[in-house]
A protein has these predicted regions:
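A short glycine-rich, His/Asp/Glu-containing loop-to-beta-strand
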Residues: 19-52, 59, 143-194
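Short, structured patches in soluble enzyme cores that scaffold and shape functional sites
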Residues: 98, 106-108, 114-119, 149-152, ...
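Conserved metal-binding segment of the jelly-roll/cupin
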Residues: 87-107, 222-243
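Generic N-terminal segment detector
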Residues: 1-53, 269-279, 284-293
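Short, surface-exposed beta-edge/turn micro-motifs
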Residues: 57-60, 91-92, 110, 192-194, ...
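Double-stranded beta-helix
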Residues: 110-150, 209-211, 249-293
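Extended, compositionally biased flexible segments
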Residues: 32, 39-105
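Glycine- and acidic-residue-biased ligand/ion/polar-headgroup-sensing regions
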Residues: 56-78, 169-170, 181-228, 233, ...
Length: 293
């Protein structure tokens, strides 16, 4: 269900790009999103192709979703990539400050997310390798999920925050429902957020409920592989359909470099349920599995 005007505004479906073709898989600008924070896109390159850009007046993070590539940022050059896809291991990522040139050359077919926010800070480009990412297992029972932090609040960036979340088949995540739409530190900060979805099988799906604190808006989105959801305010829990593991890439930016959020008070007691962790978690490890490139 995604019939309301609000649901149509915040749900962006993937472009129809053939698996053996390069192109932009999904994209949203700040103007399109009607916020002043995040530009987000996902691209695919075929082996031998390259893509050039410049961060200009933004800081950027490129998260390699799968495949191998070389990245050149003017004064640095690295080969990155190990996992075949997001379900095969932790990511490589590249952080680039404002006014930095960028070239990505595909060694294999590769897909990468490009997240950018306005910035004037002259910081240092950095390669983030799988061992640099921090894992956290949250929840218990059928609310167990795995978080892989890529750019944490303590990372030397100006605004960007990025993590990957893995939700096993049938489980809930972003739960208890929480929001981050008020600047009231340290309890909560005002953050815009993207959810970029990948599903373990092409026919799989997930649901995400979007509702506000006042009870004036309540939408449920049906999400398939490649969908992008924009979280501007309100609560936004997720559940994975039985039989399909769900991945989403979160990019956040806003009033502070903090992940502080407030739970829906009706469900806050579920945060410390005391249930044992789902033994299927973690779904991925830092070292790439046999599915990796």
């Amino acid at each position: 269900m995604a019939g309301s005007s609000y649901a149509q505004e915040v749900l962006i479906h993937a472009a129809k790009v053939a698996p053996d073709k390069s192109g932009v898989l999904v994209s949203v600008t700040r103007t399109q999103a009607r916020w002043d924070t995040i530009n987000f896109s996902v691209r695919r390159l075929i082996a031998g192709q390259y893509w050039q850009s410049d961060t200009r007046d933004e800081e950027a993070a490129v998260v390699l979703l799968g495949g191998r590539a070389t990245v050149n940022w003017g004064h640095g050059y690295r080969e990155i990539g190990a996992r075949r896809d997001v379900f095969s291991g932790y990511p490589y990522a590249v952080y680039l400050p404002c006014h930095t040139p960028l070239e990505i050359s595909a060694l294999t077919t590769c897909e990468f997310a490009d997240a950018r926010v306005p910035s004037s800070a002259r910081l240092t480009p950095r390669i983030i390798e799988p061992p640099d990412c921090r894992e956290e297992i949250r929840g218990g029972g059928n609310c167990t999920r795995q978080i892989v932090d890529v750019i944490r609040p303590e990372f030397p960036a100006e605004k960007l925050l990025i993590c990957e979340v893995y939700t096993p088949s049938g489980n809930w995540s972003s739960y208890p429902p929480h929001k981050h739409d008020v600047h009231n530190p340290p309890k909560e900060v005002d953050l815009d957020e993207t959810y970029y979805y990948r599903i373990s099988q092409p026919e799989g799906y997930a649901f995400q409920r979007l509702y506000d604190h006042a009870g004036t808006r309540d939408d449920t989105l049906t999400l398939v592989d490649g969908d992008l959801v924009l979280i501007k305010d309100g609560y936004h829990p997720v559940v994975a359909a039985h039989g399909y593991n769900v991945y989403y890439l979160n990019v956040l930016a806003g009033s502070a470099r903090s992940m502080a959020a407030s739970d829906d008070p009706r469900y806050a007691h579920l945060r410390n349920s005391g249930l044992e962790r789902d033994p299927r978690v973690p779904l991925v490890r830092a070292e790439p599995t046999e599915r990796s490139a």
